[in-house]
């Protein structure tokens, strides 16, 4: 982390493409500024809701500190927002009535999961539940693990906000976004109510949907067919992100996605993909800008190079210089690296 705006980044930005702001705006930075506690992302984007040492979900007094180390998330169930809107229209029902039904359904699933897991014995994982691996994990082998679960979060996942907006009025998140923002505010309000009523640490998670993005399209097409900008591609957009086909600058992408940033505190990331031959000074500037805005920022890179002549391009299937198909392709997306190499004979 870079605590001083005047401090140089050196070459760290080349080695660490994920950046977490502790001094900018928003939830994660506010916890660090007030308590000196870092909410480290789990996996590529998940963040824990605060649990206070004395007060639990809420601080018992001003000095009551949150605990993040040793805690975990028990799972996420994701909404299919475009399909919910399509269903409401087909049945001539209010969209928010249908949305609330599915929010309630996810709520019941989470309650059931807490109850089911709570009946398990600490002997299923002694390191976690008996020897302190998890926060509060000092149970006897025969104890049920329910007391440990009170600090665990359960998430309501969000995908395809771009496709939701497109279905609503034919405009993308770049062109509009007001309806998608209204929906996110409604979901936050309802989940906050569930949280207080149930005493469970529910969170809202911007689902990456690596596999779900394809499943949701197939589900939508089976019911409602192919709609331009909604289901005409083999995938839906990741969480609240602008569609990958949008012709926008990295700064525009940061600003557009910032609208939803504080409405997905259970899991989120903002990222930009750079071509080879990138402007390193521009990347430094964008990282600093992201830190000022309070982002968890990812720098995505791609590279294809010819193993025969050494030619490099962002993407290629055949080398334009020598005609070789003997290529190595590297894709670095968020915290995931994929390397594709030719078959050696």
Regions flagged by a language model, labelled:
Residues 2-13, 337-345:
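Single conserved hydrophobic/aromatic residue that forms the stacking wall/gate
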Residues 11-159, 163-167, 273-276, 284-307:
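Structured mid-domain segments that build the active-site/substrate or prosthetic-cofactor binding neighborhood
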Residues 133-136, 172-174, 210-224, 311-313:
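Short glycine/threonine-rich loop-to-helix capping motif typified by GTGT followed
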Residues 173-192, 345:
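Short secondary-structure subsegments characteristic of cysteine-rich extracellular domains
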Residues 212-214, 220-306:
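Catalytic alpha/beta core of large soluble enzyme barrels
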Residues 306, 319-322:
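Short cysteine-rich clusters marking metal-coordination/redox-active sites
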Residues 310-314, 323-326:
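Cys/His-rich microdomains that often coordinate metals
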Residues 315-318, 328-331:
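Short Cys/His-rich "knuckle" micro-motifs
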């Amino acid at each position: 982390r870079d605590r001083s705006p005047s401090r140089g980044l050196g070459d760290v930005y080349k080695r660490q493409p994920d950046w977490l702001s502790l001094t900018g705006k928003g939830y994660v930075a506010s916890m660090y500024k007030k308590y000196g506690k870092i909410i480290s992302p789990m996996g590529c984007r998940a963040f824990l809701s605060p649990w206070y040492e004395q007060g639990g979900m809420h601080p018992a007094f001003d000095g009551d500190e949150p605990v993040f180390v040793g805690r975990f998330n028990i799972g996420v169930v994701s909404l299919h927002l475009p399909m919910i809107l399509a269903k409401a229209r087909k049945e001539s029902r209010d969209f928010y009535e249908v949305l609330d039904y599915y929010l309630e359904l996810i709520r019941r699933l989470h309650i059931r999961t807490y109850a089911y897991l709570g009946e398990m014995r600490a002997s299923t994982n002694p390191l976690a539940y008996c020897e302190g691996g998890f926060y509060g994990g000092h149970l006897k082998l025969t104890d049920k693990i329910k007391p440990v679960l009170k600090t665990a979060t359960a998430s309501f996942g969000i995908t395809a906000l771009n496709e939701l907006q497109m279905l609503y009025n034919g405009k993308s998140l770049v062109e509009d976004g007001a309806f998608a923002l209204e929906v996110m505010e409604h979901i936050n309000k309802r989940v906050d109510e569930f949280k207080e009523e149930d005493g469970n640490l529910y969170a809202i998670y911007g689902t990456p949907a690596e596999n779900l993005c394809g499943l949701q399209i197939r589900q939508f097409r089976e019911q409602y067919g192919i709609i331009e900008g909604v289901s005409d591609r083999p995938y839906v957009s990741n969480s609240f992100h602008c569609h990958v086909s949008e012709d926008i600058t990295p700064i525009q992408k940061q600003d557009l996605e910032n609208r939803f940033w504080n409405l997905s505190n259970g899991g989120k990331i903002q990222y930009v993909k750079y071509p080879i031959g990138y402007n390193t000074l521009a990347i430094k500037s964008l990282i600093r800008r992201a830190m000022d805005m309070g982002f968890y920022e990812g720098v995505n890179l791609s590279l294809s190079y010819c193993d025969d002549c050494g030619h490099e391009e962002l993407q290629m299937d055949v080398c334009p210089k020598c005609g070789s198909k003997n290529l190595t392709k590297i894709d670095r997306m968020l915290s995931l690296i994929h390397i594709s190499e030719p078959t050696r004979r």
